Amino acid sequence: MSTDTPSAGDDESMTEAQLQARIEELEESVAELEADDDQKKMSIIATKGTLDMAYPPLILASTAAAFGYDVTVFHTFWGLEILHEERSKNLKLSSVGNPNMPVPNVVGAIPGMDRVTTKMMEKRIDDNDTATIQELLETSLDMGVEFQACQMTIELMDYDEAEFYDGVTTGVGAATALEDMADADIQLLV
Amino acid sequence: MSEAFDITETLDVKGESCPMPVVKTKNAIDDVPEGGVLEMLSTDSGSMSDINGWAQGTDGVELLKQVEDGDLYKHYIEKTD
């Protein structure tokens, strides 16, 4: 019994020291988290390669870069077309499958109609001084946006990596994308 | 307090549309010295809201003034640090 009292006193002082250490530990990790939070991140998965669908990921990526975000755009399936230096300049607009198109689907399905609707869209982009896909991609690269090309779909769809824009990251897969998304403040699938 | 300030640089993005006014403003402000003021001229009506949002979400910049002058939208942004 008599030994209990001093040991209990020891325990208490130990506890206090431990608490102090714990508080310091927690303060450190809070400071780390706050430092981490200062750097905002956005992660976009780009899966489409039509002219209209190539715009949203690039507009958001360049704008987020202007906000000082760390931005990663992971391109997979048809999204790889956006990274292809030549083909990104000639992305097509589909004249079918979109009920908001000025032509009915049966007309849109006539051979050559995709070319017509694409030309119309390109003219509007030009008349409106809207940035081109190439311009947006190069601007984003200059601003430090990381463009990644999914390795599995590069091989599946038989892309030549040398034909991508300079600065595109290859040799990445779903786990890289997932890790980016887990870390990001904003995650989008386009 | 007087609203007067000296303009350090002017960025003319007349005719350009989203997202270029914001993107080019960011690139231009990077070259403005601390305490300097960037004047940005745009014809994009969306720039009034976009530049305001960008300035609020970006460290080291302060939106001093926005002026709507017919089809021209003028923005004055100070580089704070």
What are these regions (language model features)?
Chain B
Residues 8, 57, 76-79:
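Generic signature of intrinsically disordered, low-complexity segments enriched in small/polar residues
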Residues 7-14:
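Short amphipathic
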Residues 6, 35, 70-72:
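A general secondary-structure signal for short beta-strands and their flanking turns/coil
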Residues 1-7:
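Haloarchaeal acidic low-complexity proteome signature biased toward cell-envelope/secretome components but also
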Residues 11, 40, 75-77:
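Preference for bulky hydrophobic residues occupying beta-strand positions
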Residues 62, 67-81:
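C-terminal edge-of-domain segments
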Residues 13, 19-68:
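Amphipathic, hydrophobic secondary-structure cores in small proteins
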Residues 2, 51, 70-73:
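Generic intrinsically disordered, low-complexity segments enriched for polar/acidic and small residues
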